[in-house]
Design a protein with these regions (language model features):
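Non-catalytic, topology-defining segments of multipass membrane proteins
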Residues: 1-123, 127-128, 136-139, 143-166, ...
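Membrane-embedded alpha-helices of multi-pass transport/permease systems
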Residues: 120-127, 131, 194-198, 218
Length: 250
């Protein structure tokens, strides 16, 4: 395979750099959002509260601990694929897209990657809720019955491994611009943080509108945490609706 083997020493340096970046990004994004929603007087928050009780310090500590562990897991495939890309062994590319087809693929590939990730997440997430698998694959995340923004990446190790490898593996054979990949990482992060915020930050009119009713927001995902069943999707309500697991909104 072109780009393989990759230099072990450089890959380790990249791995620890990515770990630091992921952890730093987590705190830089989550802390101000948590402060804006939970540390200010409720009347100043321009959002609809979903959680019935204040988050406890123990809950937040667990969310931060699991999210930090997940960072070490997410960094591994990212480091490997970056080193493979530098050696010409992936389908990632850089440079300014050319023409309508170039820019068209930038947009199309973004949707394909998002839908692929959403599909993978829906079915693996649903499988992890099986009673024989739940305790060692997904229980850690559900300790947050009323989640906070800190729960955005609080996964058990098995779940983190399952989620971390999909996009890097796709990047080995499905062309994606480096800028698109970075944008997807930001979308993934912001989406995860707001969906676990315990507050609905989007207007009800938009959520129930022609586009918003197909998108997963905190109103949708919060029910998954409180009921433990249904609403398994990541970005879109498509698979929940197709498979009959959509339980609506808070």
């Amino acid at each position: 395979m072109e780009g393989w083997p990759i230099p072990l020493g450089q890959t380790l340096v990249t791995y620890f750099a990515f770990t630091a970046i992921i952890i730093g990004r987590y705190f830089l994004i989550v802390w101000p959002i948590h402060w804006a929603l939970w540390k200010r007087p409720a009347e100043k928050v321009k959002a609809r509260r979903l959680s019935k009780r204040e988050p406890t310090a123990a809950t937040i500590r667990n969310e931060i601990k699991l999210s930090t562990i997940s960072a070490f897991i997410y960094a591994a495939p990212a480091a490997i694929v970056l080193e493979m890309w530098k050696a010409g062994g992936t389908a990632m590319y850089a440079g300014l897209p050319q023409g309508v087809s170039g820019w068209g693929w930038v947009l199309a590939s973004a949707f394909i990657y998002l839908f692929a990730q959403d599909t993978w997440f829906y079915f693996t997430h649903r499988i992890m809720h099986h009673r024989k698998l739940f305790k060692w694959t997904h229980e850690g995340h559900h300790r947050s019955v009323q989640p906070t923004p800190w729960a955005s990446f609080s996964f058990d190790a098995v779940e983190a491994v399952s989620a971390a490898w999909l996009l890097p593996v796709l990047a080995l054979f499905l062309p994606i611009h480096v800028g698109t990949a970075l944008a997807l990482l930001m979308i993934m992060t912001i989406n995860a943080v707001f969906n676990h915020a315990g507050w609905e930050v989007y207007p009800d009119k938009w959520i129930k509108g022609w586009w918003g009713r197909h998108i997963i927001t905190a109103s949708h995902h919060n029910l998954h945490h409180t009921k433990f069943k249904g609403n398994y999707g990541l970005y879109f309500r498509f698979w929940d609706k197709v498979c009959g697991t959509d339980t609506g909104l808070v």
